[in-house]
């Protein structure tokens, strides 16, 4: 890992990013799902439904949902009968997820505080590994990908949905203006936290483009990697297999 890593548009020490990202999500946890609805116009729900259809959870198979915090993806996969472990480095996000599960009468999920770079699971523990809008916040992405590969069984599936760079002509300017100007102001007005949402917008710009991230997934040992662009590439679903 390099001596510095990105935190939005800043370059900082790796340990500092872990701490500062933790602070961001501790601040936004209570309003995280509401802000997702507001900022995406509810579209994130459709993206997540599409993502889970790609994962194709099977009854009783073991799935690790990393950075799964508030449970949005886990609830969808559990509804299809999968045995889901929700892992997140941030306890406040997990607490929100546990509360949401109780309110919905959803049980059977395992909730665990985990660092994606150093998972506390034996090798070959899971049939599938999912991470949605989380990997760009990881300090050492190659380490997290290596851990995902390690904990998957042979034949296991890796699926990641993350923001990316749009390829639609003219849309990039609109998207940039929205994320840099509107998102932080929404954070200020709704969550009383402009700076956290400024970081979240900036972190999208610093995340590797689709081809580069796909190459990183391959370098971690995954085969048959694919990328599915959504909304002209503003969002992408990455997948790979452990063979």
Question: Language-model segments: which ranges?
Answer:
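A short acidic, Gly/Pro-enriched loop at the edge of an enzyme's catalytic core
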Residues: 117-129
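Core SAM-dependent methyltransferase catalytic element
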Residues: 214, 220-243
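Class I SAM-dependent methyltransferase SAM/SAH-binding core
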Residues: 62-119
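A short glycine-rich, Lys/Arg-flanked "PGG" loop and its adjoining helix->strand segment in the class I
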Residues: 142-157
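A short SAM/SAH-binding and catalytic strip from SAM-dependent methyltransferases
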Residues: 127-141
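Conserved alpha-helix/loop element of class I SAM-dependent methyltransferases that forms part
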Residues: 27, 31-34, 38-61
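Conserved class I S-adenosyl-L-methionine
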Residues: 157-187
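N-terminal auxiliary segments of SAM/dcSAM-dependent transferases
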Residues: 1-23
């Amino acid at each position: 890992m390099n001596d510095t890593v990105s935190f939005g548009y800043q370059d900082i020490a790796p340990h500092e990013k872990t701490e500062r990202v933790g602070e961001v999500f501790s601040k936004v946890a209570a309003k995280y799902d509401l802000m997702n609805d507001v900022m995406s116009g509810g579209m994130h729900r459709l993206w997540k439904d599409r993502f889970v259809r790609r994962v194709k959870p099977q009854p009783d198979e073991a799935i690790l949902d990393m950075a799964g915090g508030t449970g949005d993806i886990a609830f969808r996969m559990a509804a299809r009968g999968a045995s889901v472990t929700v892992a997140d480095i941030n306890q406040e996000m997990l607490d929100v997820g546990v509360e949401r599960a109780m309110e919905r009468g959803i049980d059977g999920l395992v909730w665990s505080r985990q660092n994606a770079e150093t998972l506390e699971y034996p090798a070959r523990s899971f049939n599938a590994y999912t991470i949605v809008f989380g990997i760009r916040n990881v300090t050492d992405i190659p380490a997290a990908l290596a851990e995902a590969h390690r904990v998957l069984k042979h034949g296991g599936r890796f699926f990641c949905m993350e923001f990316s760079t749009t390829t639609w002509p003219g849309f990039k300017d609109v998207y940039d203006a929205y994320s840099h100007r509107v998102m932080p102001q929404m954070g200020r007005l709704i969550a009383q936290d402009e700076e956290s949402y400024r970081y979240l917008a900036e972190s999208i710009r610093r995340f590797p483009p689709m081809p580069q991230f796909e190459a990183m997934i391959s370098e971690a040992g995954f085969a048959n990697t694919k990328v599915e662009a959504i909304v002209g590439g503003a969002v992408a679903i990455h997948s790979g297999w452990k063979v």
